[in-house]
């Protein structure tokens, strides 16, 4: 059984260190919860997984815009810090959902072009998956119990029996644009 390791006082400590800015507070909370996930080998088998948070920030002109902070390449969830969750302007990423196809090269280029900080690490190859989902906080893990279920010969049948409509099922697709679009449809 996976234990809930969230501790309200620890979370508050992270938030308090972030200062008064609400977006920075949400990012600090995301750092805290990412570390909890990363410290559990049953959730991040072989280091797999990434996390994100959607916030609002001002652009150079003072306009409030939606931003997504998503785990960057080269960072481990168990030790991640705020710079390991680079921010990207969210609206241009969401517009990509209207495309029928997108090459990996173009996807990476669009992601880099929408970074708030051009020196930030490359965002996860799963950035569009996080961007296309409507949730403020997204945790993408490779949890051992789900990997076991997914590898059963009758995986979909077993998952539907256990979870009913509470779980969306997407057939295997390589990470990237196609997976993000398919997952957003579920």
Regions inferred by a protein language model and the residue ranges of each:
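Glycine-rich flexible loops
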Residues: 1-186
């Amino acid at each position: 059984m996976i234990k809930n390791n969230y501790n309200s006082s620890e979370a508050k400590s992270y938030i308090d260190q972030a200062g008064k800015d609400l977006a920075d507070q949400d990012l600090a909370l995301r750092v805290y919860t990412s570390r909890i996930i990363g410290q559990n080998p049953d959730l991040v088998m072989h280091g797999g997984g990434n996390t994100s948070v959607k916030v609002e920030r001002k652009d150079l002109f003072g306009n409030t815009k939606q931003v997504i902070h998503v785990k960057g390449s080269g960072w481990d969830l168990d030790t991640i810090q705020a710079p390991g969750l680079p921010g990207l302007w969210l609206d241009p990423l969401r517009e990509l959902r209207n495309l029928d196809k997108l090459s990996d090269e173009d996807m990476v280029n669009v992601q880099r072009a929408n970074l708030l900080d051009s020196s930030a690490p490359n965002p996860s190859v799963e950035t569009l998956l996080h961007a296309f989902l409507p949730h403020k906080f997204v945790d993408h893990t490779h949890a051992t119990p789900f990997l076991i279920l997914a590898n059963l010969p009758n995986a979909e049948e077993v998952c539907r029996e256990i979870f009913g409509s509470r779980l969306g099922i997407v057939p295997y697709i390589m990470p990237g644009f196609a997976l993000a679009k398919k997952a957003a449809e579920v």
